Structures are given as structure tokens and as C-alpha cells.
Design a protein with these regions (language model features):
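Acidic, metal/ion-coordinating pockets
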Residues: 1-268
Length: 268
């Protein structure tokens, strides 16, 4: 069978404390603890003032666009490829969002109608431990970016970094790797990840991508002690940490992110 995961509710406070104001909750593990687990997760995020997209406690919540305001309004739409063989309870399919393209586009359109200036789609998709996007990811990205309602797409699930590209003038990140994880050292690349930083320009309702930057990160000790996230470039410049490993991570990540030869994607 598949592994099942749960974490203490306090992690939501940590998510907020480091600066996240919204997140995707749609994944293949969304229902590892059933509908009570979905409710508990969203309750904890609400208590920490972190907005969320991808799972819901009610149909009304599922149908309400998720929008974060920071001057401009950013809409978040998310979905996942499956639930490891499980399904939401009968009559409650709204409790979890899949990545069927028409469904995601409809939600993106609803976010724009609700006032979002920019809409980002988060797709839990790909093949675990593979650095190349799957045909399904590519087809989904093509469909999504063809919609005027979608301004960017990013993916997660593979646990390793995947390439970035542009489709229909819009940034697509096929895989961001891991952010906080402690996977087996037999899985190369699972201690590497990227933080994306994208700058948008909105003029007369039209959205364009001004910058698309990636920040390489390396996850700390796999054996003992607390897990830490290391900003690769910062520690290389300061001489801190394992310089050889930091350098190889920087090279691995940069080679993968830019492997499709897309102009305008640079290391921050």
C-alpha cells in the first residue's frame, strides 16, 4: 500500500511564521486521514491565517475563489492527479480538487471574475524522483496556459527539481523539488529544491512576466539533528557549510531548471 502521513497542527503556525500566506492542500495524500483530516488541516491553517486551495470542508468553500491581496490580488487554484486509490466520501467530491484541465480553468476564471489580477495554478503532478516532466504534465500545462485566466503554473510531487519553461508566454515550473523533507539518501536529489520568485506586470488588465528567478536550496542533515534549509548561494559566498556539496547542488539545480533553454529564467 501507500504510506500515510500526518503532522502536528502546530506546523501551520510555523508555515505562517516564515512568511507563507497561502498554500495548496491538494495532493495524493490529502485524504490520508479522511475527511476529518481535511477538516483538521484547514482548521489549523485558518487559525494561523494561511489561506488554502485544493481541499474543502463544504461545497460553498470549494466554490469560493482563494485570493490573497498585497496591493495586487493573486488567485490560487490547485489540484492533484489522484488520491492513492482512495476517494472523497460519496456525494462530497467537492472536498478535493483534481487536475482535470477544464475544472482548473473554470476555477481560474472564477478567481479572475472575483477580482484576482493574477491567477496561479498549482498542479500536484509528475513522476516521483524523475527530473523530466511527463507527457501528462506537458499536456496539462499547454491547456492551462492557453487560457487567458491562467498566468502561471507550478507543479509539485516528484520530490526532485524539474525544468522551467514558457508556454504561451507564461512561466511553467514542472517541479520545485523538496522544501522540508527527510527522505532516504538512496534517492539522489531529494535534498535539493528551488524557491521560485516571479515578478509580474499588470497593465490594463493584461498580465506579463517581468522576471522568473530561482533560488537553489539544500536541505540539511539527513541523519541527526534538526532539518534545516540552506540558501545555497548565500552559504557559498559566506564559506559556510559543506562547500563541495553546496556547489554540486547549485550546479545540479541550475542545469535542471534551465535544461529546456528558456530565455529569461535566471538564478536569483
Amino acid at each position: 500500500g501507500y504510506p500515510e502521513f500526518a503532522v502536528p497542527a502546530e506546523i501551520a503556525k510555523g508555515i505562517a511564521a516564515v512568511g507563507f500566506d497561502a498554500c495548496s492542500t491538494a495532493s495524493n495524500h490529502s485524504f490520508d486521514r479522511g475527511l476529518p483530516g481535511v477538516r483538521a488541516t484547514l482548521d489549523a491553517l485558518d487559525a494561523a491565517h494561511v489561506k488554502h486551495s485544493g481541499t474543502a470542508r463544504t461545497k460553498e468553500e470549494a466554490d469560493t475563489p482563494v485570493i490573497v491581496s498585497h496591493g495586487l490580488k493573486l488567485g490560487l487554484v490547485s489540484g492533484a492527479y489522484g488520491l492513492n486509490g482512495s476517494t472523497p466520501p460519496k456525494g462530497k467530491s467537492w472536498a478535493w480538487s483534481d487536475i482535470e484541465a477544464d475544472h482548473l480553468i473554470k476555477r481560474a476564471e472564477a478567481a479572475k471574475k472575483a477580482g484576482a489580477d493574477i491567477v496561479i495554478v498549482a498542479a500536484h503532478s509528475g513522476l516521483e524522483y524523475h527530473h523530466e516532466p511527463t507527457e501528462e504534465q506537458i499536456r496539462l500545462a499547454q491547456r492551462l496556459t492557453a487560457s487567458p485566466a491562467v498566468d502561471m503554473v507550478y507543479c509539485h510531487h516528484s520530490h526532485v527539481v524539474e525544468p522551467w519553461t514558457r508556454m504561451n508566454g507564461k512561466i511553467v515550473m514542472y517541479g520545485l523539488g523538496n522544501l522540508v523533507a527527510q527522505q532516504s539518501s538512496n534517492m539522489p536529489g531529494t535534498d535539493e529544491g528551488v524557491v521560485g520568485r516571479v515578478t509580474f506586470t499588470v497593465r490594463s488588465g493584461k498580465v506579463s512576466t517581468t522576471k522568473a528567478e530561482y533560488i537553489p536550496i539544500l536541505i540539511g542533515s539527513k541523519n541527526d539533528g534538526p532539518i534545516r534549509i540552506h540558501a545555497v548561494d548565500t552559504e557559498l559566498k559566506s564559506g559556510m557549510g559543506n562547500q563541495a556539496r553546496l556547489k554540486s547542488a547549485q550546479q545540479d539545480i541550475s542545469r535542471t531548471v534551465t535544461s529546456l533553454g528558456v530565455d529569461g529564467v535566471t538564478e536569483a
